[in-house]
């Protein structure tokens, strides 16, 4: 005879155990990124993190710019003389680019410049 309350309790315990394991493996990582003349230094153009890490990008720039993290759909306006934070939990795995928004097309879509940073999220 199957006991659904016992099965439900076992599934809940397993789910909570999995969530705690994921939380224990997750890290908080911070990267200070400076945009100068429309570029990030070569040694900061590739960032590697693990799935479920909390990633904080601290942006500074020499000219006003809007940046967009593709795949997570996060956009920030960055102004000279300030640090602008872009924080997210790396839930999706894969390669995600951060690109500047340069303007709008006649149809209203925004245009992107060259990739500033690539973020690789590993399982």
Predicted regions and their residues:
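Bacterial N-terminal signal peptides
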Residues: 10-21
């Amino acid at each position: 005879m199957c006991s659904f309350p016992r099965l439900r309790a076992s599934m809940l315990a397993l789910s909570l155990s999995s969530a705690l394991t994921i939380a224990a493996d997750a890290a908080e990582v911070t990267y200070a990124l400076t945009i100068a003349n429309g570029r990030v230094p070569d040694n900061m153009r590739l960032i590697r993190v693990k799935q479920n890490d909390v990633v904080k990008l601290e942006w500074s720039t020499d000219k006003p710019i809007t940046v967009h993290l593709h795949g997570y759909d996060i956009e920030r306006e960055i102004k000279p003389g300030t640090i602008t934070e872009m924080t997210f939990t790396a839930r999706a795995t894969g390669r995600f680019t951060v690109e500047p928004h340069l303007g709008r097309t006649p149809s209203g879509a925004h245009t992107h410049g060259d990739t500033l940073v690539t973020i690789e999220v590993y399982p």
